[in-house]
UniProtKB/Swiss-Prot annotation:
It comes from Aspergillus terreus (strain NIH 2624 / FGSC A1156). GO terms for cellular component: nascent polypeptide-associated complex; nucleus. GO terms for biological process: protein transport. It comes from the Eukaryota. PROSITE patterns: NAC_AB (PS51151). Pfam families: NAC. This is Nascent polypeptide-associated complex subunit beta. The keyword Transport applies.
């Protein structure tokens, strides 16, 4: 598009407050309506309200007295929610957790959560602990190999004789 034509089109559109200064009387014709400046205010509160409205349509009910929620990840870490607000809709199999989640290591939570686990969870926790120990061993073995490589003294190899070149 031609730059001059583009500049004329931009000048013909008035946005916001009327201009002041030497170009104040320019573009004052009736054919150029004033356009409002679009101000977008997006807040997380609006998202929460939409979520609450959707959950209300699903007929969720609050579940009281939930002290903590732990979500186990595949890498061995745990997402821990302390005193979350929990809402549930059993017919639609939907649960909503509200609160600040913290990512913690499994070893930080083990003593406190053992009495809360059932037999299925204990078996999965054992597998998770074994895989965690294997990861620890693999990391320690890799670090040990690096240390061994650094400490090795290179072997002497018969090569060129530089003393004869100095003379």
């Amino acid at each position: 598009m031609d730059q001059a034509k583009l500049a004329r089109m931009q000048a013909s559109v008035r946005i916001g407050n009327p201009p002041s200064g030497p170009r104040a009387n320019r573009n004052r014709g009736k054919g150029t309506p004033r356009r409002k400046v679009k101000k977008v205010h997006k807040s997380s509160g609006a998202d929460d309200k939409k979520l609450q409205a959707t959950l209300k349509k699903m007929n969720v009910q609050p579940i009281p007295a939930v002290e903590e929620v732990n979500m186990f990840k595949e890498d061995g870490n745990v997402i821990h929610f302390g005193n979350p607000r929990v809402h549930a809709s059993v017919p639609s199999n939907t649960f909503a957790l509200y609160g600040n989640g913290e990512e913690k290591e499994l070893t930080e939570l083990v003593p406190g959560i053992l009495n809360q686990l059932g037999p299925d969870s204990l078996a999965s926790l054992r597998k998770l602990a074994e895989s965690y120990q294997n990861m620890q061993k693999n990391q320690a073995g890799a670090e040990g190999k690096k240390d061994d490589e650094e400490d090795d003294i290179p072997d002497l190899v018969e090569g060129q004789d530089f003393e004869s070149k100095v003379e």
